[in-house]
């Protein structure tokens, strides 16, 4: 039986990957059908797929030099964020490069009306038959063995040698999967005694029993401060996976916890067919959580809910063995939409509470999307991500066929151009919450801005967990905020929600408050935060030295499948930066004194 299964596997791989000719070069390749998936047959030749092609930049350092120049206090260009046209000029490939790619597509049968040249990216739509000829591959239908969802994908694709040096990636091709909201626990409706507490009682509780905007204002030194209504201080909230923010629930939340904000609302940015449907049985908890705390803590700021259709891709591992049926790429769709907005329409803060294991995405995809976060940073956007809810890891094994024991960093939290937010719990003192993800990237090297801080932690750590992580990788999270038992109105009822998905929007609102403080003094918004945080801003955060994360328990917390067990696996909160709470939680008054 095992031999038969192995022969069938070889047959499926062979069917999925034709032999590339001498005139083609392989761009991406999977050695085997990802675990949990089965090839069930050839794709319909007439099926239409929307592709994104990322053009390899001739001088990638130009983007990195620019983001550090405009984001590092003390440099001559600090705060001089680029306009969209300036960013386009920075990234625009040579004319002959673009022409060669467009020519390849049109000569290969793609309708010119279905090609959109966006400078360093090209979007094109075509049918499976044409795509197979273009990329010298065969697209097949792959079925998820857990939920019978099917996807059109391939295990390998190629492009002509003549243009191969210009092609960083084409997707969706080899990507299997989805994102997850980073909310580790959704509680039942709250007890009557909590529901009946007054706003003043919640503030006095200092977030011990339930987190509300009142206690966060008290805990983090915001007081009654509100932002001013300005066009140059906008907040964007990311929405994926058909999560829809409900206006009625926001109204209930503000009436209950922020009565002075009653009547304030948010606008919608609908991307690639995204919706924000009101009412109905669909999921809204994550979207409501994000919107209620962003609006509640900065209610005069202009807030936009960016709802993007589709579900993100991955190469499945034990943490994420399944996905929904949709060929769109939401991160790419959202990011390409945002970087093309005029600078006066961009959010100055973008908060996202979604992520996946870093290893579940091909390296070309993580690099391309991380560079898009950097592009937003050059235009003055502070990109905020939750760090994740699996501690050092959940499955704690590699998905390369070796199943080696390994901690699992979370992406996009591990991208060096985002600010990653860990979680805390309790007060007097705050402690690291056990589910707060953190660690070290296996994809991105440690950026110079955090080199000294991370070296200090590694010296304390010594040889513990040696071999389970890359000590030279980008370390995360950067900072933290409360992450346990947030009061949220969902479908008309108050519910408690935990996860770093709560920490991220709370921090985003505080960053918007800092931007408001700077703008009132004639200074620009903060933009990409990390160079400032690691050089000076860290002194405005309360260091968390108690508690720690946990993970690698032997069972994956999402799928329930048996996984690698690492006894006592944890990152501990320590003095200074640590990979569970970063530099700690915000003290608004202290932060205003160390702003650039």
Curated annotation (Swiss-Prot):
Domain Peptidase S53: 210-596
Signal peptide annotation: 1-16
Propiece residues: 17-203
GO MF: metal ion binding; serine-type endopeptidase activity; tripeptidyl-peptidase activity
Positions annotated as glycosylated: 265, 403, 572
Gene Ontology CC terms: extracellular region
Subcellular location: Secreted, Extracellular space
Catalytic activity reported: Release of an N-terminal tripeptide from a polypeptide
Cofactor(s) annotated in UniProt: Ca(2+)
Keywords: Calcium, Glycoprotein, Hydrolase, Metal-binding, Protease, Secreted, Serine protease, Signal, Virulence, Zymogen
Main location (coarse class): secreted
One of the GO biological process terms: proteolysis
Residues at the active site: 286, 290, 501
Enzyme class: hydrolase
Purpose: Secreted tripeptidyl-peptidase which degrades proteins at acidic pHs and is involved in virulence.
Protein name, UniProt field: Probable tripeptidyl-peptidase SED2
Source organism: Trichophyton verrucosum (strain HKI 0517)
